[in-house]
Amino acid sequence: MRPAIKVGLSTASVYPLRAEAAFEYADRLGYDGVELMVWGESVSQDIDAVRKLSRRYRVPVLSVHAPCLLISQRVWGANPILKLDRSVRAAEQLGAQTVVVHPPFRWQRRYAEGFSDQVAALEAASTVMVAVENMFPFRADRFFGAGQSRERMRKRGGGPGPAISAFAPSYDPLDGNHAHYTLDLSHTATAGTDSLDMARRMGPGLVHLHLCDGSGLPADEHLVPGRGTQPTAEVCQMLAGSGFVGHVVLEVSTSSARSANERESMLAESLQFARTHLLR
């Protein structure tokens, strides 16, 4: 019998609360672990502090998200090459299986030119998997407003339409020919990408899922799974029925929650969705 797929909670899912809140929710609700989003919060950058939280709440760190967002360009320095190296070291120190990283930005030329080789070298020297995540372009239809942009995507049958990609070689990590990938279901919604097809194309290289949802808006939504238009249940069922040996992490936005109870309800609903559709 294949082992159950572990389900984690991203520390980004409790924003604007701090990382400790994610450990607390994960413990209380029954998540199997957390994904550490390294960004502006000082604790997220302090591996010793994160290790203490993990021990205090008895919640392991399953994965580390490298500080590669636009808002975290100065976290752990300004050199993205060194930041990725440090992310892998952090994962090793925390006992995490995976580092999630975005494709390089186009203006990070030196980093972009050596990215594939760096990822391969890091994996060759470590047991940590570096899973490159699918992203999305800047869509021109965002200027038409939410309703119209969603309808335009529906009418064209998916795809971003006229758009500009900030990523090299593209926002599709499969263009980089890496060994391991992260599939994010909010990003597929924003890009108009067929997420089931992308999961199949990633094949055994798919080792990490950001379980969330989206409705086709040009902005990244990170909805609770089941509240958007993505085939979230089908993707989970595909993984459950396969030889998937990675982790599934809920990376959902709860910043709209009007109370602590509402945030907890969103996180509990997300976990229940995952448990239901990942059952083996």
Curated annotation (Swiss-Prot):
Keywords: Signal. It comes from the Bacteria. Pfam families: AP_endonuc_2. The lineage of its organism: Bacteria, Bacillati, Actinomycetota, Actinomycetes, Mycobacteriales. Gene3D superfamilies: Divalent-metal-dependent TIM barrel enzymes. This is Uncharacterized protein Mb0509. The keyword Glycosyltransferase does not apply. Residues 1-21 form the signal peptide. To M.leprae ML2432 and S.coelicolor SCO3347. The keyword Membrane does not apply.
